[in-house]
Amino acid sequence: MEDGSVSYGFKNIFITMFATFFFFKLLIKVFLALLTHFYIVKGNRKEAARIAEEIFGEISDCWADRSPLHEAAAQGRLLALKTLIAQGVNVNLVTINRVSSLHEACLGGHVACAKALLENGAHVNGVTVHGATPLFNACCSGSAACVNVLLEFGAKAQLEVHLASPIHEAVKRGNRECMEILLANNVNIDQEVPHLGTPLYAACTYQRLDCVKKLLELGANVNHGQWLDTPLHAAAKQNSVEIIHLLIDYGANLKCKNAQGQSALDLAAPKSSVEQALLLREGPPALSQLCRLCVRKCLGRNCHKTIHKLYLPDPLEKFLLYQ
């Protein structure tokens, strides 16, 4: 009986200690949250972000300091947005994560709101803590109109490697029109980013057939992917036979090996349609195909523009242009 009382006493002590620890931990988090709010009110967002990181372990998508301007831009309420601007609201207010109203407008594809913000001095190349620019958000939403407006106001189409890449985002989501606008503004068609590879590699990974076609047509390097992995390697892991044939037609090398020493055929699922397509194309290409690849290589990346200047018979010109 006495042993039971001792055991019960220890149990109560343990529960009390645990409850006290939990209470103090909760109290500290509440205090830090209040301190974060204080710094936001005072305008010291950098310190607020640091404290938020202490609370959450990483800077999370905390929207506690979203302004009415952010809400108006996100919802595409142009009249409300213009009213707030007329009242003197700063168009470059940002959240803890450095998300501006322009980021919100572009993510929602609200071109009228984006233009109003830009006309009133919004930073066109503002970067969030996650490396996203308004142009990246516009490509994410697939708004070609927003992309055009941003470029008109001086948005950088080609960004540093450590920032989120607009062209890769456009390709990932199959937003071909946004991709074409960026390429027309001198974005490197073979830009490689560490986690996505080149735009062509990304298009093959996400099976965006339209983007694959256009990138190849515009002269993307068919064998440049992600380090030693080629676009054909990426396509072989998926199930699009049409992309496999497209890549090989444009000169993809079936014998290329990745870092693990694997060819595209090694990566294809056994007895799949992709494996069959690769096996069928393993042999030597036709002489006409070799000639086409040779002519296009001699003319360079802009062959789609220069072939017309050769004044070739129409059927031959169409063959060289894969039409």
From Swiss-Prot:
Residues 273-323 form the SOCS box domain. GO terms for biological process: endoplasmic reticulum unfolded protein response; positive regulation of protein catabolic process; proteasome-mediated ubiquitin-dependent protein catabolic process; protein K11-linked ubiquitination; protein ubiquitination. Pathway: Protein modification; protein ubiquitination. The keyword rRNA processing does not apply. ANK repeats lie at residues 64-93, 97-126, 130-159, 162-191, 195-224, 227-256. Its main location: endoplasmic reticulum. One of its GO terms (cellular component) is Cul5-RING ubiquitin ligase complex. Keywords: ANK repeat, Endoplasmic reticulum, Repeat, Ubl conjugation pathway. It is found in: Endoplasmic reticulum. GO terms for molecular function: ubiquitin-like ligase-substrate adaptor activity. It holds the Pfam family Ank_2. InterPro entries: Ankyrin-SOCS_box_domain (IPR051573), Ankyrin_rpt (IPR002110), Ankyrin_rpt-contain_sf (IPR036770), SOCS_box (IPR001496), SOCS_box-like_dom_sf (IPR036036). Substrate-recognition component of a cullin-5-RING E3 ubiquitin-protein ligase complex (ECS complex, also named CRL5 complex), which mediates the ubiquitination and subsequent proteasomal degradation of target proteins, such as BIK, DIRAS2 and RPN1. The ECS(ASB11) complex acts as a regulator of the endoplasmic reticulum unfolded protein response by mediating ubiquitination and degradation of BIK. Belongs to the ankyrin SOCS box (ASB) family. Substrate-recognition component of the ECS(ASB11) complex, composed of ASB11, CUL5, ELOB, ELOC and RNF7/RBX2. This is Ankyrin repeat and SOCS box protein 11. It comes from Bos taurus (Bovine).
